[in-house]
Amino acid sequence: MTDPDFVAENFEAKRMNEDGTERYSVIAKKMEHYPVDNSAVLEEPRLTHFDPDKGPVSIRANRGVVSSNGETVDFRDAVQVRRAPFGGDPEMTLTTTFLHVVPDKDLVSTDREVTLTHGNSTVKSVGLEFNNKTRQLKLLSNVKGQLQTPQKDGRAALPFGRKH
């Protein structure tokens, strides 16, 4: 890669909804812009997506690469996704080494190993596709996990709904 044409430290960018509310923000310790392909490399990026109906989701990594048109962000190395508990839904976390994000379409995907936790459930897979608009999750291969559904009284049930 050639030298960057500009560098920004403590970088922050925000995307707003039509009503003026914040849709998502991207912050990074450092951003380097490369004119040869109009991409940007981010050091310690964090993207936070704001959705009043689903709660905020944050993505962190050691590095990120923003595409030339700004439509995608590739998070690399020690990728962590977190959605705090929201509206009765338990915390959700995801860890992987690479995550491709299309913020304006609410899409994320990877072809790498992932570990996904949702409350007391844990699933591991190789590859994942997630559409946050439709809440559809596709685990691509080698899926293994333990799913625990909450009982009506709020206690976690044993896997597959067996009584304890």
Each language-model region and where it sits:
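Mature-chain termini and adjacent capping regions
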Residues: 1-164
